[in-house]
Swiss-Prot record:
Gene: Bcl11a
Location of this chain's protein in the cell: Cytoplasm; Nucleus
InterPro entries tied to this protein: Dev/Hematopoietic_TF, Znf_C2H2_sf, Znf_C2H2_type
Zinc fingers classed as C2HC-type: ranges: 45-71
Keywords of the record: Cytoplasm, DNA-binding, Isopeptide bond, Metal-binding, Methylation, Nucleus, Phosphoprotein, Repeat, Repressor, Transcription, Transcription regulation, Ubl conjugation, Zinc, Zinc-finger
Protein purpose: Transcription factor. Associated with the BAF SWI/SNF chromatin remodeling complex. Binds to the 5'-TGACCA-3' sequence motif in regulatory regions of target genes. Involved in brain development. May play a role in hematopoiesis. Essential factor in lymphopoiesis, required for B-cell formation in fetal liver. May function as a modulator of the transcriptional repression activity of NR2F2.
ZnF segments: C2H2-type: 170-193, 377-399, 405-429, 742-764, 770-792, 800-823
SMART domains per the UniProt record, alphabetical: ZnF_C2H2
Name this protein carries in UniProt: BCL11 transcription factor A
Length: 835
């Protein structure tokens, strides 16, 4: 379009090639064309050059029809600036005659024609030129970059009757083929003769104005601005994004006010982009040359015209990507050029680059899969998806067999820290002592913090757990049941525990490690303090050795209870010298007094050889063999050479009963060192309230075992040592006020309701009334059975059946574990039946 269509007045630039001064022309034009120009800032009017009629910019089609048929003005024939010397007589024919269109022009005319293409001189506007704009085309140019001389483009080619009507036909000068329209001629010239005149729109409307990329080489035409002439250095990487059509358009369009002066480096080109498929066909040498020589890259792009692309590619991101690279490295055969990397389209699954930031390294815990998974949190083995990456890491260990979490007290290993935490409760019975550093550098038990009383108990609970561990190892009937229960619980709770967060896992690791460290440090200190390894044949030191092994001698309650028990033993064994020895049995002589006890006496009483053997058993309860005392390596093992009689098994709990009674007695004598505000904060706070009239604890005195003998749960030793428990005593509530029916008679734990106590009591008795009908699973709680039944199948989900025992499973990994556990001798087939 001319500048008059944009509402701009005529302004002639200073040119050197005009043979006559232009001032006279300007003075003649200004009075005639005074009303042509719209206001300087108005851009929405089109003015006819002949009749001075204004048209809105939206009515450009009406303006074109006006120029074709209705405008009969004579101004277009009078003012002819920059004419050639004289038109030939052949060119003076009427417009109704056929017109031949030349495709080649001489280099002398190239300068003038290219200058006139910028809309400075001509007074006529050719209909074919308007049709090119109407169909989304730019003005055609020849192979040398000049405009193709279409009929009536300027006054020198059709001086008569151009504004009246369009020529009847157009003839190609190369093949002499006539055409009825200039548009058909342009299509013929581009498709048949290979001239690159315009760009075809794939998705746009024909009425959408497009800016075409001229195909001529711009080096020969001095009027065309160079590629890198818009204030950009030659070695700037942003020159790679400069397109010849856009540069020439910006250079001329910005100067004429057609386009808003937006910064070219941070706004995408309006309507057309680079075609990545054509750029990839360019050679590496051409791309390297284009990096350093933008004019050569201009030739490459013009020789390889590019089809239009939908405006979906974000150039601003690619500009930021190139922001840090000011120079291009030398090209190698295996490495794509910078331009190829720039123009490579974004992949659908890839993340677009931003500021050339390198991608983060992958997680160390997740092995890289052979093929990128569809979802980042899906298992590459079975395809199961997870919410959190930590759950995927834990689940992947079920396929790889990795078990990074190992118990410090036994050889148990698991895949989750929460499972290790649950396993540690079998050692601790849900009461692990918090460990702190004492003055001598050893880990000792400290008072629990508020709010942690349910999880943190006293060291005597750990003592009982070791006793129970010893019983389970020596009783063959308990081993399969406990082992199966633990493994079945692992299987049934796997799916629920996969939803736990990493913070909980980290916290549980820290607590479990502290508990294991305290027990191992106690074992190590027990061996180093003696100076010699305890042999298998050493017996008769059960109580002092337990004190040293569990680091209980430094705790005030256990130390006082220990003194009382030793004092009672001393009184019974030496009746004649009871008072004298009681004064000398102070803290310094406790270990020596325990060493002077005969091998045939336990707790100050005579006993049979079988009973002495059981007394020696209590000594071996926590000490273990010398080979198992290396820190953080093996479990606390008992000597296999020591054969335990079946009748002596219940005697192992006598030690625990005595300690429990002594602890309760010491709490009532004086203010305790560990102050508990509520009776529920200590497992032993209400144990003294369950006392019978003879002073013995209820749970430690079954019927028929009060009259002598160490076998069973005898509490005579503890009853004799605590004669004051029968009365309320100072600071102790009465038995009616303090007694509660929801207190466990085995460990003294207090519950809010009786149903919880009933379930808890089954952990001591081993009762499991809820059994699965499909497998041998049994549990003490109905909710656990309900959760377990979900592992066998749920409504609306696939069920995987074992081919051997036909047991159903809802998760395939659970079936794999079942096959490894029960049918490890058979190979698991891949074609598992699903229903």
């Amino acid at each position: 379009m001319s500048r008059r269509k944009q509402g701009k007045p005529q302004h002639l630039s200073k040119r050197e090639f005009s043979p006559e001064p232009l001032e006279a022309i300007l003075t003649d034009d200004e009075p005639d064309h005074g009303p042509l120009g719209a206001p300087e800032g108005d851009h929405d009017l089109l003015t006819c050059g002949q009749c001075q009629m204004n048209f809105p910019l939206g009515d450009i089609l009406i303006f074109i029809e006006h120029k074709r048929k209705q405008c009969n003005g004579s101004l277009c024939l009078e003012k002819g600036v920059d004419k050639p010397p004289s038109p030939s007589p052949i060119e003076m024919k009427k417009a109704s005659n056929p017109v031949e269109v030349g495709i080649q022009v001489t280099p002398e005319d190239d300068d003038c024609l290219s200058t006139s293409s910028r809309g400075i001189c001509p007074k006529q506007e050719h209909i074919a030129d308007k049709l090119l704009h109407w169909r989304g085309l730019s003005s055609p140019r020849s192979a040398h970059g000049a405009l193709i001389p279409t009929p009536g483009m300027s006054a020198e080619y059709a001086p008569q009757g151009i504004c009246k009507d369009e020529p009847s036909s157009y003839t190609c000068t190369t093949c002499k083929q006539p055409f009825t329209s200039a548009w058909f001629l342009l299509q013929h010239a581009q498709n048949t003769h290979g001239l690159r005149i315009y760009l075809e729109s794939e998705h746009g409307s024909p009425l959408t104005p497009r800016v075409g990329i001229p195909s001529g080489l711009g080096a020969e035409c001095p009027s065309q601005p160079p590629l890198h002439g818009i204030h950009i250095a030659d070695n700037n990487p942003f020159n790679l994004l400069r397109i010849p059509g856009s540069v020439s358009r910006e250079a001329s369009g910005l100067a004429e006010g057609r386009f808003p002066p937006t910064p070219p480096l941070f706004s995408p080109p309006p309507r057309h982009h680079l075609d990545p498929h054509r750029i990839e066909r360019l050679g590496a040498e051409e791309m390297a040359l284009a990096t350093h020589h933008p004019s050569a890259f201009d030739r490459v792009l013009r020789l390889n015209p590019m089809a239009m692309e939908p405006p979906a590619m974000d150039f601003s991101r690619r500009l930021r990507e190139l922001a840090g690279n000011t120079s291009s490295p030398p090209l190698s055969p295996g490495r794509p050029s910078p331009m190829q990397r720039l123009l490579q389209p974004f992949q659908p699954g890839s993340k677009p680059p931003f500021l050339a930031t390198p991608p983060l390294p992958p997680l160390q815990s997740a092995p890289p899969p052979s093929q990128p998974p569809v979802k980042s949190k899906s298992c590459e083995f079975c395809g199961k998806t997870f919410k959190f990456q930590s759950n995927l890491v834990v689940h992947r260990r079920s396929h790889t067999g990795e078990k990074p979490y190992k118990c410090n007290l036994c050889d148990h290993a698991c895949t989750q820290a929460s499972k290790l935490k649950r396993h540690m409760k079998t050692h601790m019975h849900k009461s692990s002592p918090m460990t702190v550093k004492s003055d001598d550098g050893l880990s000792t038990a400290s008072s629990p913090e508020p709010g942690t009383s349910d999880l943190v108990g006293s060291a005597s609970s750990a003592l009982k757990s070791v006793v129970a561990k010893f019983k389970s190892e020596n009783d063959p009937n308990l081993i399969p049941e406990n082992g199966d229960e633990e493994e079945e619980e692992d299987d049934e709770e796997e799916e629920e525990e996969e939803e736990e967060e990493e913070e909980e896992l980290t916290e549980s690791e820290r607590v479990d490690y502290g508990f294991g460290l305290s027990l191992e440090a106690a074992r190590h200190h027990e061996n180093s303090s003696r100076g010699a390894v305890v042999g298998v044949g050493d017996e008769g030191r059960a109580l002092p050795d337990v004190m040293q092994g569990m680091v209980l001698s430094s705790m005030q309650h256990f130390s006082e209870a220990f003194h009382q028990v030793l004092g009672e033993k001393h009184k019974r064994s030496h009746l004649a010298e009871a008072e004298g020895h009681r004064d000398t049995c102070d803290e310094d002589s406790v270990a020596g007094e325990s060493d002077r006890i005969d091998d045939g006496t336990v707790n100050g009483r005579g006993c049979s050889p079988g009973e002495s053997a059981s007394g020696g058993l209590s000594k071996k309860l926590l000490l273990g063999s010398p080979s198992s005392l290396s820190p953080f390596s093996k479990r606390i093992k008992l000597e296999k050479e020591f054969d335990l009689p079946p009748a002596a098994m219940p005697n192992t709990e006598n030690v625990y009963s005595q300690w429990l009674a002594g602890y309760a007695a010491s709490r009532q004598l004086k203010d305790p060192f560990l102050t508990f505000g509520d009776s529920r904060q200590s497992p032993f706070a209400s144990s003294s309230e369950h006392s019978s009239e003879n002073g013995s604890l209820r749970f430690s005195t079954p019927p028929g075992e009060l009259d002598g003998g160490i076998s069973g749960r005898s509490g005579t030793g503890s009853g004799g040592s605590t004669p004051h428990i029968s009365g309320p005593g100072p600071g102790r509530p009465s038995s009616k006020e303090g007694r509660r029916s929801d207190t466990c008679e085995y460990c003294g734990k207090v519950f809010k309701n009786c149903s919880n106590l009933t379930v808890h009591r089954r952990s001591h008795t081993g009762e499991r009334p809820y059994k699965c009908e499909l497998c041998n699973y049994a549990c003490a709680q109905s909710s656990k059975l309900t959760r377990h039944m979900k592992t066998h199948g749920q409504v609306g989900k696939d069920v995987y059946k074992c081919e051997i025992c036909k047991m159903p499973f809802s998760v395939y990994s659970t079936l794999e574990k079942h096959m490894k556990k029960w049918h490890s001798d058979r190979v698991l087939n891949n074609d598992i039946k699903t229903e």
